Amino acid sequence: MTVMLSCLTQQQELLQSLADRVGQPAIQDNLYFCLAGQFTWVEDWYTTAIAGDVLIFDAGEKEQLARVLQQWEQFTGHVILITGLTEEPDPQTFLTQLALGKQQRCGERHFHWIVLVDPTIEEAFRGLQTFLDGKSHWLDLRLGVGDLEQCTDELWQCVWLEPSPLAPEKRQEMLVNLPHWLAEIVDQKQNLELEPISLLQAKLSLLQGLARESRGEMGRKQAQCHYRESLDVWELLGDTEAIIWLSLRLGYLFLLQAYGEKSRGHQLWQQTRNYAQTAIAALENQQWHFTHGETLNLLGEILRGLEDWEQLRQAAENSLIFFYQLSPFAATDTTPERNQEKLWTELELQGLISLAHSYLCEALVEQWKFDEGKEALKRAFETRPKQVEERDYRPCLANLHYLAGRVQLANDQIRESLMTLRQAQTLVSFEDNPRLYLAILVELRECYLQLEDWLAALAIDQEYQAREYRLGQRAFIGPKPLPCWPEQRICRHPLAPEKMLGGGAEARSAVQSKTMVSLTWQDLQKVWEQKPTPVLVLTGEPGVGKTSWLAGEVLQQMSPERVLLVDFTPHWAEKLWVHLGESFSLPSLGQATTPELVSALQALPILDLLLVLDGENGSLPWQKSPSLRQQELAQVLWQWLLTTSPSQGVRLLISVPPTAIADLYEELKGQLGEEHSLPPLQYQTLSPPTLGQAENWLTQAMAQCRHPWPPSLQSQFLGDLAMEGNGEQQPWLHPIDLQLLGTVLEQEQVTKSADYQGKKLDEWLTLAVQTYLAFLPPHLLKKALQLLKSLADGQQALCLKTEYQLLAALYSAPEPAADNPPEFAQEDIQQLQLLLTLLLRGRLIIVISQATLPYYRLSTTHLAHALQGKSAVISTPALINAGRRGSKSNPNLIAPSPGDRQQGNEDLIAELEAGSSAEEQVVAQKLKAAQLQYQKLVAGINLEKQCQFILKQFLVYPLEALLAAVKTGQDLQKLVTPETPLVQYPSLAPWLSLHSILARINECNRCHHEGPVTVLRISPSMENTPPLVLTATTNGIAYLWSFHGELINVLRGHQEAITALDWSADGQYFATASADHTVKLWQRHGEEVATLRGHEDWVRSVHFSPHHQFLVTSGQDNTARIWNFAGEQLTLCQGHADWVRNAEFNCHGQILLTASRDGTARLWDLEGREIGLCQGHTSWVRNAQFSPDGQWIVTCSADGTARLWDLSSQCFAVLKGHQNWVNNALWSPDGQHIITSSSDGTARVWSRHGKCLGTLRGHDHNIHGARFSLDGQKIVTYSTDNTARLWTKEGTLLTILRGHQKEVYDADFSADGRFVFTVSADQTARQWDISQKDTITLTGHSHWVRNAHFNPKGDRLLTVSRDKTARLWTTEGECVAVLADHQGWVREGQFSPDGQWIVTGSADKTAQLWNVLGKKLTVLRGHQDAVLNVRFSPDSQYIVTASKDGTARVWNNTGRELAVLRHYEKNIFAAEFSADGQFIVTASDDNTAGIWEIVGREVGICRGHEGPVYFAQFSADSRYILTASVDNTARIWDFLGRPLLTLAGHQSIVYQARFSPEGNLIATVSADHTARLWDRSGKTVAVLYGHQGLVGTVDWSPDGQMLVTASNDGTARLWDLSGRELLTLEGHGNWVRSAEFSPDGRWVLTSSADGTAKLWPVKTLPQLLSQGGQWLKNYLTHNALVSPADRPGAKVT
């Protein structure tokens, strides 16, 4: 859009009001507008209020009106005629001419205009509105000299004037349109033939340069020409300000051009310096009066680029002198706006002063004047604008932090420097200030190198190279996957801030990225359009560009919110759940059951989401044994992703290496199970680039390179790396070879073929490797090169080696004992793992897993030959598939098996032992030791694989899984000794599997039948007589079992299905009813007594009378009948019009109750007379039962209700709520509650008066029935969803009994309530142990349990609660005392170290002292607010309390106050004694920790945290203090409070930090959901991932080998020192507030906001094996399907 400008500023208000009037109808009519006419600059109201074209002109300009009429045919937009500004012509005459002219030239085409005239004539033209067709055109209006100068001057004022009269966004928008306006102005200037040396010419040249500067390299060169033309004129005219600005601008552009030249004496550098000196001379003449923001920025960038630090220092000092002359004005005038007398607002002036100080600081730092630099930096921070959140000042603040980091680094404050630099990194983005961002990376790299954090240093190196690539500084980025095409890069220099170059939006415009891959987004779309929607599996060799392809081809095609990228690691399921939970309301993983997880996923809306599981950056899920909870979550997510999610708009893309294809298929198959079919897998292989593709890539890369290669060098470079194709396949290159060789050539500035030919290919590649690893110290560099050469030392070009083979090659182990594997030093193992990680991340090597054993090899054949010293090009087609060795999908390419490798080692040993050399004998012994270690490793790997299958198996076959886990545990036991710590086990998987299974298993026995089992009854409890279990099947057979699962008898008397069972009250008889129309009576052990014949159809029920004299039966012949034990029918009850489903006696045996399909229940006497009719149900009555006292009746019906009746057949309550049939209704044993079960998938608990007390939700399908336990406290439900579920009577789910493969027909409790028995259509009856097993729950508190502690002996427990009490417990869970005297909630309590006393602290402002029997001894009064923390001294003689009143107080053990530690004005969160009891450390809300003598004298203050300190602790030797803070860090201090180390890494509040027992490690926990392990140097040893909520507390095991964390995700978790999760302690229903080990390390005690505390066992492998064997004893002894080898007494193999 061309905009003509005018000096008619009086039109501004009119035009603004005009916008308001035109805007609304214009938007509705969708018209097109263009602004032209009397050429005035108007603020951009037309672009926001109107979307189109408008023509505005002054009716007083007659010449202009004539031109408009001549050009009218070219204009098709709105016409706005403005009158009243000058003379007023006759508007009607003009409009008539306008209309006639348009009609003559355009025929019948429509047109439209809006006329604004005086109100007197407005009505006359209101109706003249029609629409125009066609395209709008520009009006070609010729200007005079006066108009041209005025137009140029207005542009000049808007662009040049500082401060600008325009808002920043308006000014930026005007700069974008500047080239279009200038083109027309310059065109008019040429027509008028003005003088070349004039003010107009100077302004136009400057504006033209500014307009072209943002157009890349060519645009900058054009800008240089325009600026020089303008500078020549300004120098003649003598305008100092323009001379300064143009000199700096030219110097800056030459600096950009010169930056690629290494030589500082290059002509471009000299021109840069000349222009800078010109500007400085002009500034000095003007006493720096023209130093404003842009001038100072330009000068600083130029002098920085020239590295002229002395001149930069002088410039900064001169600027400060000038700024401080203005500062009193700025300080007293707080007006935010500018005016003509005021150059800057206060905020802008602060920014300029701070900027000048920062330049001064940088100059001083570069001159190694650190003390002066530190002072300048201090001033820069003091004067910086306080509104740091404003975008304009964030780069300035980032620069200050960068300089502060450099000063700290120079003063050897490495960790402080690291934190400061990280903060600087968060304040600036790479796109906004590339130079500063890269400078920060350089200093960060130096920090990591000094901290010897080589992995972090490598990551910074790689990021730096990638950033330089984006800037066009390099064409190659080291041994990494191929980048996208070069046009994706940001093609500007790091010294070019976006504000200075202008056109930032254009510079950052997203360009479609391209890779050397032919697969496109359209190809993916076609794949996903198939039915059923397939899963896309992306695979290819490491380094071919899968990640680049994902970023370039996939992520750019979809908005970021529609793409979810998750690392495909063992924790992928938890991470995916968290990602989904951030956008949708998903239940917490710590509390939700599996059905709730499934329901939540199925309830998700249409997502339109692409889920990418990227398996390139770590171990894959099946390569590590997850916990059972992770297994369940993964199975839920897989079933959702593969079955349901496609219909919800979710598309799945999985990226894995070729070797993982077969394992991926097995994983998906195993997760879906037999009931679901696996959707099609669409494989897409990204092949290495062909020679032609690489040529295209290199050509484009060189086109933007500062030192491009000639075609001859490009051809030779690609030719040396090319590999011959197979058959018709084209020659190809490995991308890592290309990047590795290209990087070293670029670094060595090789630009000629002759220079390249000076070395062979293998020499170049070896140099490239050495250069890449040059950041390592000499000892590590040497080992890294030895490792690479070891991998190259094999018969094959790409040989595979295990970690232990590399250990044996690089390190020596002490001589092992006989038959024992060698034990390499832990330091050597850690060093090798570090080197492997470094080389893997650098893509110099790759890892291939075979049977979960990792094998390492070099990434490319060229690299292997270079390290071997061979330069021959290998042209074998087998290399294309080198990475697929060991893939089950390609059996022809199998790596040597462990057995083959073992045989090779044995041959080598034998050969060496045959020699006579002592040296050879030593080598042979070492190899033999390595072989033993290798065998042990392989055994551990095999155990890992077995346990992965076992944990999956447990979800379906619990007993078989436990048996298999016991066997793997026995195998592991053979590899270790009783003294071997867990961290040295070759595999922890068997220990983890046993712990996990034994903590969750319920099934303890299984009885197999010959058909579906439909009915179950347990004999009544009898003294000295064990109960028996009676089951029956659909094929007419009944089975009699002992309570331990031993088959006693098989009863084959019925000819058809058995429908009902019952025991007599004395347990001596039982009865079976059948579809064969008969009932049979049997003695206890299965002798048949009588057959009851008389029914004419199926018999549906049978019940004994209470005094076991009679039986009552009911059947489908519409009758009920009473029989004696001789089988004689005594009474016939007739009256029902349909089946009688049930009949039973009341508790006295005098009344009979029947329920029928005719919709009624009836009461009968023993003579068969009907004495009551219960009518009211609208469908058939499925069951009817007397209450235990015989006074009430409950019935349930297919009409969805249950009803309560009295003995007079009056209904007094209708139980409504179910949405389908009510299948069963039963009374609780005490008659106070009723349980109903329904086909709607729920059961409900009701009071005896009909009030619903709770709904039991969770089953997926119809619930057949439900039963109360004998004590009435538990309920079991059984369902067609193949499960039974255990609940409290209040409706809380306790556990799900999984294992049945088909629907569960019946279930019942044992008399003691410890067991549940179930029967199923899967032909089994199962026994489930529902006791709490090893976990002990401490129940009694009525509110949160805030903390729980062991006494020193570990035989007593203390809990404190928000219910204002503390409680003492035994380790069996018995409460022995309630400490109830506080008036507020008890926050903390502790046993004294001698075990004689207890102290509690409360919100009631007191602490109280008790003896260990719970008797209160004294009250510690003195605090003025809540007591937050209490601690005994190590000798039990003193107590320290910490309070919200800002004090800590010291007391003796009689309650006398000894000292007040009064230093703070805010909360003291914690207070701890030193190990010798002589000192105390306190943690406070004022960001400090205090160190005190016990008598109250201050020793030191730990200052440095930037937030409240929540925790403080002495080290075991009392020499150091450890603190944890809200500022996301923990810190270590010396005894006087001087800072030593900062543990920075957490992303949120650090709640607690603890030294390990030996003091060599530190554990921290944080609100960022993680815990971390650190060594004493501050290096992160491990990050503990797994919790789904904040982690609040941590505790070390007494031996320091494990730690336990507690989280608000409802779990506590155990970890080893490598960060591996050992156990998840699940069971609490709310936040776990604390967790600690017992003194012997065998138990963990947790407290929770659910009002309970729990004791969890931590068992050794022998204990677990013993427990597992005991659990399986009955199953292995009596189950007929168990192998004889697994029977007790047989050797388990």
Swiss-Prot record:
PROSITE patterns: WD_REPEATS_1, WD_REPEATS_2, WD_REPEATS_REGION. The keyword Membrane does not apply. Pfam families: WD40. CDD domains: WD40. It comes from the Bacteria. The keyword Repeat applies. Keywords: Repeat, WD repeat. WD repeats lie at residues 1008-1042, 1053-1083, 1094-1124, 1135-1165, 1176-1206, 1217-1247, 1258-1288, 1299-1329, 1340-1370, 1381-1411, 1422-1452, 1463-1493, 1504-1534, 1545-1575, 1586-1616, 1627-1657. PANTHER family: TRANSCRIPTION INITIATION FACTOR TFIID (PTHR19879), TRANSCRIPTION INITIATION FACTOR TFIID SUBUNIT 5 (PTHR19879:SF9). This is Uncharacterized WD repeat-containing protein sll0163. It comes from Synechocystis sp. (strain ATCC 27184 / PCC 6803 / Kazusa).
